């Protein structure tokens, strides 16, 4: 059967641009030789729109400080918008009296209100009882660490974004980076096969939850604003794949969005390799985009006890200062994981097409295994499915390469939820 091969990869994450290993080089930049360090810093300086010389030590330190995990910059964690509920009562026996612009009157007037028109623009309200209100407030977030794309990188400025949610902005950049990494132009890649032999499989586990999508849809009515015509559609979790088809590839081939928490990317890769191995597809673009660094998502994960809070990190370090840079410690003493944004994409081909087209072969994806955990008391807790997945993956590698290569010439890349 056809073997699925990787012929391109790319995207954007807190370490920078993924294609050609730029992001990986940022992770190990202190261990690179001088030439590769220079190239990595130059790439990041361009991405971050820095005016200074990337050879300058001050610029290099700025690049280091404003990539990877760090204190949240996307919003101000020291002033998160909030509403505090309150009950207003009169200070004496009199009723509560106030006036507001007439156009701000609610559509449904409370039964304990008496209205008196002052003029064409204002109305006086007399409230016979106590008045329940929401007071605009600001709170300090208990979580201030996140993985964010490099400071200064603005995906919305690179195309006509038209109020697109951040996750979809990252999608356009990430998928474009992956396709260009193949060396083929979009038209060339599309014309290698028949229209129904190319597919895009992608999703977003969280969907788009900022104010330009589901965040605005759900919050605007409670904050005195209206939802827009884009909020509902652009929040759908399969929208990253739709954006690739519509804005980048112009494909009329098959598309799908498979969602599964932190395994969303793997679910879509599995669909891709199954289709290539069966001969149904010859080119598949597969990826995932997540942009969960928004206040209500951070708070949602925090209250379920999933995120590393600042006070807990201070306690781990026995310090009065939260070290945001070291918030993610998946294989060490930790207090929870750290949210991050990213958009990562693969371009897969069957082996025959890759050889015929002269594509640059980066590796193969022979199998993907995903198993449920059976009965368990806690959904997020570890389960037997992990053991089944690893066992089948090792058996597949043994069948392909032999036991000696499996034991002595292979390695396991551990996934630590950080």
Predicted segments, located by residue:
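Hydrophobic alpha-helical hairpins/lids featuring a short glycine-rich hinge
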Residues: 168-228
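ACP-dependent fatty acid/polyketide chain-elongation machinery
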Residues: 1-160, 351-365
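Conserved catalytic cysteine-centered active-site region
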Residues: 45, 122-169, 207-271, 304, ...
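Short acidic, glycine/serine/threonine-rich loops at helix termini
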Residues: 211-215, 268-270, 294-300, 359, ...
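Condensing-enzyme catalytic core mediating Claisen C-C bond formation in acyl metabolism
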Residues: 2-10, 14, 312-411
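Beta-strand segments within the central parallel beta-sheet cores of soluble alpha/beta enzyme folds
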Residues: 188-199, 255-260, 284-289, 360-369, ...
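Conserved small-residue
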Residues: 175, 200, 265, 272, ...
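Active-site-proximal alpha-helical scaffold in enzymes
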Residues: 170-184, 237, 241, 255-290, ...
């Amino acid at each position: 059967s056809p073997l699925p091969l990787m012929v391109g990869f790319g995207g954007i994450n807190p370490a920078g641009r993924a294609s050609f290993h730029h992001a990986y080089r940022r992770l190990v930049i202190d261990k690179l030789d001088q030439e590769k360090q220079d190239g990595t810093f130059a790439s990041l300086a361009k991405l971050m729109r820095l005016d200074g010389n990337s050879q300058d030590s001050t610029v290099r330190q700025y690049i280091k400080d404003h990539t990877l995990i760090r204190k949240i910059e996307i919003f101000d964690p020291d002033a998160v918008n909030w509403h505090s509920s309150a009950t207003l009562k009169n200070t004496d026996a009199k009723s509560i009296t106030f006036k507001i612009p007439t156009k701000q009157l609610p559509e449904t007037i409370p039964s304990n209100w008496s209205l008196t028109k002052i003029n064409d623009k204002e109305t006086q309200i007399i409230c016979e009882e106590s008045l329940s209100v929401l007071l605009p407030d600001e709170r300090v977030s208990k979580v201030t660490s996140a993985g964010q794309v490099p400071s200064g990188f603005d995906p919305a400025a690179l195309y006509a974004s038209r109020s697109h949610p951040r996750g979809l902005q990252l999608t356009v950049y990430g998928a474009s980076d992956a396709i260009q990494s193949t060396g083929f132009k979009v038209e060339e890649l599309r014309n290698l096969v028949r229209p129904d032999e190319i597919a895009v499989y992608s999703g977003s586990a969280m969907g788009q939850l900022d104010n330009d999508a589901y965040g605005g849809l759900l919050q605007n009515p409670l904050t005195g604003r209206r939802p827009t015509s884009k909020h509902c559609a652009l929040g759908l979790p399969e929208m990253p794949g739709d954006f690739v088809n519509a804005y980048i590839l112009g494909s009329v081939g098959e598309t799908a969005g498979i969602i599964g928490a932190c395994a969303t990317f793997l679910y879509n890769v599995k669909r891709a390799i199954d289709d290539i191995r069966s001969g149904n597809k010859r080119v598949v673009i597969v990826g995932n985009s997540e942009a969960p660094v928004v206040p209500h998502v951070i708070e949602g994960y925090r209250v379920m006890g999933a995120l590393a809070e600042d006070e807990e990190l201070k306690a781990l370090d026995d310090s009065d200062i939260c070290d945001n840079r070291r918030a993610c410690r998946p294989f060490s003493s930790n207090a929870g994981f750290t949210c991050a944004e990213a958009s990562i994409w693969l371009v897969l081909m069957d082996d025959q097409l890759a050889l015929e087209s002269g594509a640059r072969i980066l590796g193969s994806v022979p199998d993907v295994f995903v198993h449920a955990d059976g009965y368990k008391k806690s959904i997020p807790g570890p389960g037997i499915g992990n053991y089944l997945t690893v066992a089948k993956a090792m058996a597949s590698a043994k069948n392909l390469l032999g036991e000696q290569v499996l034991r002595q010439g292979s390695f396991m890349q551990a996934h630590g939820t950080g």
